[in-house]
Amino acid sequence: MINWVLLLSFLTVALVANVPAIFGKCIDENGKEHDVGETWQGDECSKYECFVSEDGNYYYTGTGCPSFGVPPECHLEAKSGDFPECCPSVTCPEE
């Protein structure tokens, strides 16, 4: 059980989105401009990075906490801070 819990803590969810660009910057979902290579924290527990592809399109990648089933005897414990420290962890009773 302990190994399973530790494995889950290292899994993340990632996305890549083609985004509007102006003057060589990515525009995020809140309308804020970001330079290529810049990383920023999302509204929730997530992290984003702006990049430009070989074809000249601007994208940002987003990485967030995984969602997974929690065994009935366990629960999710909320965390704070920047990604990935803010991702919840699974807490189970000692065996």
Curated annotation (Swiss-Prot):
A GO CC annotation given for this chain: extracellular region
Stretches assigned to coiled coil: none
Reported tissue expression: Expressed by the venom gland.
Main location: secreted
Disulfide bonds: none
Domain of life: Eukaryota
UniProt GO MF annotations: toxin activity
Post-translational modification: Contains 4 disulfide bonds.
Keywords associated with the record: Disulfide bond, Secreted, Signal, Toxin
Subcellular location: Secreted
InterPro entries attached to this UniProt entry: SVWC_dom
Signal sequence annotation: 1-16
The keyword Transferase belongs to this UniProt entry's keyword annotation: no
Tagged with keyword Signal: yes
UniProt similarity note: Belongs to the scoloptoxin-16 family.
Protein name: U-scoloptoxin(16)-Er12a
